Amino acid sequence: MTRHTRTLLLSAAATCLMAGTAWAECKPVTMADMGGVAPGDFPQQYDLSAFEAAAGCEMTFSANPEIETLNAEIKGNPDLPPLEERLPEEPLVVVPYDAIGTYGGTLRAISNATEAGTSDFLSVRHVNLVRYADDLQTIVPNVAKSWEWNDDFTQLTFKLRKGHKWSDGAPFTSADVKFWYDNIALDSKVIEKPKGYALVADKPMTVDTPDDETVVFNLPSPKPGLLASFATVYAQPFLPKHFLGEYHPDLNADADTLAAECGFATGLEVISAYYGNSDWTDTPTPMLKNPDQVDCLPKSTYPTLESHIYTAETTEGRKLVANPYFFMVDPTGQQLPYISRQDETYANDNEVRILKLVNGEVDYKSQSLTLAAAPILLENQEKGNFTVQLAPTIAMPTFSFNVTSEDMAKRELFGNVEFRKAMSVAINRDELNETAFFGQGVPKQFIAFSPTPSFVDPETEKMYTEYDPDGAKAMLDGIGMVDTDGDGFRELPGGAKFVLNVQFATQGIGGEVVELVAQYWSDVGVQTTVKEVTPDEYRSAQSSNQLDVGAWEKGQPTAIIMGNKELFVPPFENYFAHRTGMLWAEWVDSNGASGVEPPEWVKTMMADADAFQGAMPGSDEQAAAGAKLAKATAENVLFIGTVQAPNVIYHRNAVKNFTEFKTQSYEYYRTFPYLPAQWFIQE
């Protein structure tokens, strides 16, 4: 008797008594036609027993006919057992939008480069403990089967799926979550500093594992937003202990000896080769980072729970195949994903990427596209047999100044709020909207929260946004920044020549936006130059405190801020996003031992962020703390907002079960709410 049959007997008996009907094969229901099947507890998905009860059926499982071939391409994977032994006892049943899919095909993606412009493609295979449903309001199970909070939001318990397996067939258990937290997320030998989502008011949690299917997060103080953080964050709170743990010296006394067999100095070097000393899930694998050692290693990449896994990686791109142990099925019992392969190619030139989209050489793209690309894509969508959606965004283009510049004269200037106010009102947002965004956007100040929550005074997002070049000039005059040599451009208050150098990457902001803003600043006498660089060059300069100006999109929904306070703590976001105040961050991280002490308003904002996260959702306390955060953000204009406008989502019409997105946004992790494991290719 199989595991499935054993669990089925109980549910079948109960349901047949209620319905008075015989069991049958499960019907091919879709969201477009549910065939009388009642909705489940969560939108578009059921646990197996719940679906069988609702549909009055007994599910028979089937797999991709290519799956053994695909499995053979995954280095280190053994031969496959039967499908029922590869699925958990309660697989997640996904109801497709429009049609039951067919297997096969290759999803073609394009990114800027390794770790650059990749998150839209990453999200296609992404999983986490939970996710947001496509309404972007409802948190639903994903890897976890269920969850439960205690009364004061200081303990969050997850139930995992019994029998769930990693992509190499090893059991996935609560130990893999604890390994991620204790031995990776909190281990400074692996990740230098714990990320904000892994802490509660800057203090660590503890993780208990009462049994293989139960994970308990114990919080030092309330953090109701922790669940939403899991639903949106790119990082995955589980790692294969059975594999990576072998190379961790805290878990295996022979870790360094094992690593030395393949030419690594320590076991931690092997973990770095696989995991990258980062929680970003597309850091280069050993196939790219350690080509001379990868043949010796047991696997080319560490096992995953995602829908697809890497099999090849070069500087030109990457290839993936379907995970033969993936935990989702469709209503007829077909194991997901439908699509057998994924190919990602790199093109850092924006014009090259657009041309490939126009020619139909890419199946899905949203990241690094700007509204400026919309006309040519819309003009060609019928001929090219693709669809372009203009969807609302959450983040908007923002600018910042290096308030801890190594150049002391610049540091003093950039740290002066009057300078930042002047540079904000120097921007003609209405013209910027018409020129760069075809009049489709809304001029706004950056307030961190997006969309604007009800607890924020609408006037807050208007602070220092009214175009006032004369006022900007007067403010610059007032801080002693005047033109002393008659060349039309202002010198520093001490009289030294000043040129504002703006470097930008099209992954983070449109070139047309940067060019216009630079012209507005030059128009009020601040000489500004512009240079496009690669995302890697931009991030490297930002990390080394070498940028004059930060230029990248920014903004997060309330649900994310409830779980991650990075927008209010120096450097005010992560490595892949928009940062400033790098030496403030060093001071915070070192508890004042090094770096530069931030001003009091920054320290107050950090405390208010803790208060916001610790308050009950919807409470007066939360509203008051949130309003203070938004006001402080706008008043101090550390980040200057511009225009919030819709942006482009592209997909080829051959990609089926592709629905309209509520937003074009990284903040809900792009495709993750829309279950791309249901996509299939039909030419």
Where are these regions (language model features)?
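Middle-to-C-terminal accessory/interaction subdomains
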Residues: A624, N647-R652
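A structural "hinge/loop" feature
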Residues: T2, D98-V124, V143, L226-A235, ...
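Proteolytic maturation boundary segments
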Residues: G36-V37, D41, L70-P81, E85-I100, ...
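Gram-negative bacterial Sec-dependent N-terminal signal peptides
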Residues: M1-W23
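Glycine-rich and polybasic anion-binding loops at the starts of cofactor/ligand-binding domains
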Residues: T642
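Extracytoplasmic/periplasmic ligand-capture domains
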Residues: E25-A63, A72-E73, R131-D135, E148-W149, ...
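Surface-exposed binding/hinge segments that line
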Residues: G196-P286, F661
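N-terminal lobe/hinge region of extracytoplasmic solute-binding protein
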Residues: I67, N71-D151, D182
